[in-house]
């Protein structure tokens, strides 16, 4: 009977697979009987007045309005009054298509104010020029998971002036399908790198200032996790800001997205129109203050998410908290940032944002924050952050982006400020509505953060971030290094490994107050002695690991230090060895040879440590003394003058 049940189960799976919609690409690529794209009904939009829009934008900029990149064109298009239906050759699917064109648009996006997709169906939006072997990242797909109580769907941008809207529906469910297109949004600025390339010929580019710093640059090292929390987004297909996923005390990965109240997302209709662009960042580090940094980037806008509901909003501290409609896509590898609601200032701050809603950038401040009211007057609702001359700034489009403490916790979201690449002195600063103020907000769940970010009322003052629950967890790297010395100079070789990625950055501390980020640095010490050296490595997933070792340098002629920094575990009642290879020496050892020993162990009185030469001579260093004290971190001096160079000490056991 088990075999029979198995056969029935396989049959059921086979039927289910046969009724699933085709792959996420235009149906005509898989069904030759469907009309070619050039035969699909075309609707051309009325001309838009771009000159008027740009004149309006000058006034919008003066008022500090959030950036506009598109003009909305009102339409009323449904499958009942537009486009045409066809059936796939196998008779299983009905396919409805409509081409839409708006002359000179740099990109298009669409607002559907009545959307319902039955199970097994899908909606595609793609460039009219899409080819079977073309970039699949330009195709946006929506299905039943995008159904929502507002019955709205707003799409990601499609580069170019002409796009195809395509619905593929199981034939027996066509009656359930609902679609009403009411907004065609004409991009006249250049939203995204592909649209900006189309704009380049006319000199229009929606790029950010050259002083900004790409998140892939070294300034992002150690912050790779919080970088993944930040996304750019569009509102109603025409305006744009920045926001961030935030964690809550339940650690349940609710899709809470924090942004600015002034971005206008505080109503049900505008919240439903959000389209978030995740991991939209340049692939290389463009040196700040170079032409490349101020030019078009290469960030991908293929990782998108549509729709949300409002949880809370409060004008005084300029926050809006949304809950995005859909769970995180594991492939996006998102991060939920922690937060800090304490009533205090901080010694510095970090901003991650989308200036001009272009590729993601990072700004750093090493100046203490201060309390201000919005606009810079006396008050405590906002944090004032002073940017360094070379630490990046924010720009229009950065609004709503998070400001982080040095511990990588959200302290607030960007309200605004005078900062820009050309700003100097105190004008190179910004103001952020504080999480502290927003926590109690206006005194009700709809105007404060506490109900949502601390649902069980734990009273937590701060929490750390939470990584994605999907995909393959990032395995932390293993830090390791070796060293050699010559006189007062030590040369270090990084031998760290990362099993599921690569080492992205290194931070050395040489034990005398000096540091380095080089891969294999050399260090010349001012005086002879033994120094504790630490290496902290960060992998490409943001995980870190630290290795601590020691190095002994001597000012004497020809002095050389040999080490073995490989960690060795010490089991109970066991003998272990840590071999040290000595080569390239002549003559005998010194009568005052220093031997640095570093052993981390509870109760040093349990330990016996010997130095054993290759000829078997044993030099005792430590013999079960020290009582209840822990660890042996000590330099011993031994007379090794009887040891010839080729018979130098071989191991420490």
Swiss-Prot record:
An example Gene Ontology molecular-function term: serine-type endopeptidase activity
Domain PKD: 474-553
Domain P/Homo B: 555-653
Reactions the enzyme catalyzes: Preferential cleavage: Lys-|-Xaa, including Lys-|-Pro
Gene Ontology cellular component list: extracellular region
Enzyme class at the top of the EC tree: hydrolase
E.C. number: 3.4.21.50
Signal peptide segment: 1-20
Post-translational events: Three disulfide bonds are present.
Family per similarity comment: Belongs to the peptidase S1 family.
UniProt protein name: Protease 1
Species of the source: Achromobacter lyticus
